[in-house]
Amino acid sequence: MTELPDNTRWQLWIVAFGFFMQSLDTTIVNTALPSMAKSLGESPLHMHMVVVSYVLTVAVMLPASGWLADKIGVRNIFFAAIVLFTLGSLFCALSGTLNQLVLARVLQGVGGAMMVPVGRLTVMKIVPRAQYMAAMTFVTLPGQIGPLLGPALGGVLVEYASWHWIFLINIPVGIVGAIATFMLMPNYTIETRRFDLPGFLLLAIGMAVLTLALDGSKSMGISPWTLAGLAAGGAAAILLYLLHAKKNSGALFSLRLFRTPTFSLGLLGSFAGRIGSGMLPFMTPVFLQIGLGFSPFHAGLMMIPMVLGSMGMKRIVVQIVNRFGYRRVLVATTLGLALVSLLFMSVALLGWYYLLPLVLLLQGMVNSARFSSMNTLTLKDLPDTLASSGNSLLSMIMQLSMSIGVTIAGMLLGMFGQQHIGIDSSATHHVFMYTWLCMAVIIALPAIIFARVPNDTQQNMVISRRKRSL
């Protein structure tokens, strides 16, 4: 990194800053949800829409971000992403109702969707290929620190200021980032093929409508017949996209991707797997505060061991997969995550709070091994010509499945609980216990998919510490 020109190093710092903002925002909000509910006069059972609106918007917008950067320029799009994210943060802080907050989170999600993929594209264009791995390690490190700081920082701001400050802190940082981007980042553009707008709209409508249909009766009071119509419309949009992609060589995502068996299995497993695991970062701080009566700051601190376990496991997961193979690792970690989630609930309800950090550390380790294995299984056998498209589709599916997971978690809470549930009461404990039992089943089900993964015939390359630091 020291051999790079000064202006290139500054550009990498700007990208790293964008990664940090986006990753921090994905975790800082969860700790504040109970306080937001109280301030807005809403039931905590409805607050999952604050998370879903952001993550679903990211999923919808991801396919367009790379094309926009190539067409309009990486500087212009990265600048627009930071501005939209910052404006969304301002509107979030000014929101006086849940509906206003959800709309502001959608605007934030549009900016967040463009930040990370455009940042990766920027690094590819400004750094020589020989230094690409070192540069990506540098810019993604803040993205790993964001989830570590997010829960605790969110807890501090909520407890000692107000929930509005989890959004207000983005404003001065966003202004500085936007100015630095405009002044220092080059505006690379390349010739692009025509954007598949019909395919993009079909996928966007399908994803949004199906997610809305999952929880519309609880959160929005939509009638069952209307929900059935929404579900049918969403499914029809997805089917129309498949027909469109079959006939169109320039489709957003080519159906040739699914000729690779490991990609099909991995994508299906990733979708199902992240529905279950996507519930945990949302449900855990909510349960700690509403179910156990923890303060926001205490609940935020309890999330740190989970992030530390996740970061630590990334260093050894390749060796584990090489030793035991994808099928065994994925089946074991899927079932293991379900068991650890039940262990967490058991330890919490028994009052053994001193064991909770250890259980959450274990949960983070198991979840990280599962995530890394799912990602590499999905992409490892794709031909070079389809690798970029496959990676984009996987990124979209990851965000979509997490939004569905949070939606289902909120739906389960609403099904087992009343309109308002009390803090640290016996009835509340039962609501969360039944919810966690259902979550454990949902988390375990993808093991059926992963049991079909073929035996491995190829070892994964392990990057030494020396190469990591180059």
Curated annotation (Swiss-Prot):
Pfam families: MFS_1. GO terms for molecular function: transmembrane transporter activity. The keyword Cell inner membrane applies. Residues 1-11, 70-76, 125-137, 186-196, 243-262, 307-341, 417-430 are periplasmic. It is a multi-pass membrane protein. The chain crosses the membrane at residues 12-32, 49-69, 77-97, 102-124, 138-158, 165-185, 197-217, 222-242, 263-283, 286-306, 342-362, 396-416, 431-451. It is found in: Cell inner membrane. InterPro entries: MFS, MFS_dom, MFS_trans_sf, Multi-R_MdtD. Its main location: membrane. Residues 33-48, 98-101, 159-164, 218-221, 284-285, 363-395, 452-470 are cytoplasmic. It comes from the Bacteria. One of its GO terms (cellular component) is plasma membrane. Belongs to the major facilitator superfamily. TCR/Tet family. NCBIfam families: PRK10504.1. This is Putative multidrug resistance protein MdtD. It comes from Salmonella schwarzengrund (strain CVM19633). The gene is mdtD.
